[in-house]
Amino acid sequence: MQLNKFFLGRWLTWPLAFSVGIHGSVIAALLYVSVEQMRIQPEIEDAPIAVTMVNIDTFAAPQPAAAEPQAEPEPEPEPEPEPIDEAPPEPEVLPEPVPVPIPEPVKPKPKPVKKEVKKPEVKKPDVKKTVAPPDDKPFKSDEPALVSTNAPVKSAPKASVPGVSTSTGPKALSKAKPTYPARALALGVEGQVKVQYDIDENGRVTNVRILEATPRNTFEREVKQVMRKWRFEAVAAKDYVTTVVFKIGGTTEMD
């Protein structure tokens, strides 16, 4: 115990003495420097004092710039949920079809046969013609005798209807036949088209009218197309009639 106290007291005295020595040397150095400065300081001569006006605003601290609005952070996209593998639906069990009894056809009842009743023929009584006896005196009449109606009577000639047929009037210079429609040819359909038209001063066909078409909406278009190419003599005529016949096999005929 005594040794411990000895070493402890010795350990505390050395740092204390070292600290006191350092502080004393610092104080002595400061006193020496201050005394030397007081000795060396020269005398200050009186000099005129220059006064300048200074704008305090120039030395004012600059106002802080307006803080820029901070961009809001974009929301992160939510992660898509992983698809859950759904179990395949169980196949529906179809019920077995129940056999339906087929009803027997009902036989129609036989219609009663009507018996024809023959009416008895009624015989007309014979009427005997009575002939008047001839007179001895001849009968005279002032009226002229009637002409027998059995004699042939000459009728006046009928006026010819212009343009009823192409046999009279302007002759055809170019009259091509229409083509057989492919659809009608494939189906094996035949028919005819009856058209009425006029001819102008240049021999061209105008004012085409469909009078009859069998079957309808099958051959009319081909007939109208080919009639645009027909040429006649340069004589005007009206109400010409032509019949175009389409036969199976792709042939056409015109009257």
Curated annotation (Swiss-Prot):
It is found in: Cell inner membrane. Sequence repeats lie at residues 72-73, 74-75, 76-77, 78-79, 80-81, 82-83, 94-95, 96-97, 98-99, 100-101, 102-103, 104-105, 107-108, 109-110, 111-112. The keyword Membrane applies. InterPro entries: TonB (IPR003538), TonB-dependent_transducer (IPR051045), TonB/TolA_C (IPR006260), TonB_C (IPR037682), TonB_pro-rich (IPR049924). Residues 94-105 are annotated as: 6 X 2 AA tandem repeats of [LEIV]-P. Residues 113-143 have a biased composition (Basic and acidic residues). GO terms for molecular function: energy transducer activity. Residues 71-89 have a biased composition (Acidic residues). Residues 34-255 are periplasmic. Belongs to the TonB family. Homodimer. Forms a complex with the accessory proteins ExbB and ExbD. Interacts with outer membrane receptor proteins that carry out high-affinity binding and energy dependent uptake into the periplasmic space of specific substrates. It could act to transduce energy from the cytoplasmic membrane to specific energy-requiring processes in the outer membrane, resulting in the release into the periplasm of ligands bound by these outer membrane proteins. This is Protein TonB. The gene is tonB.
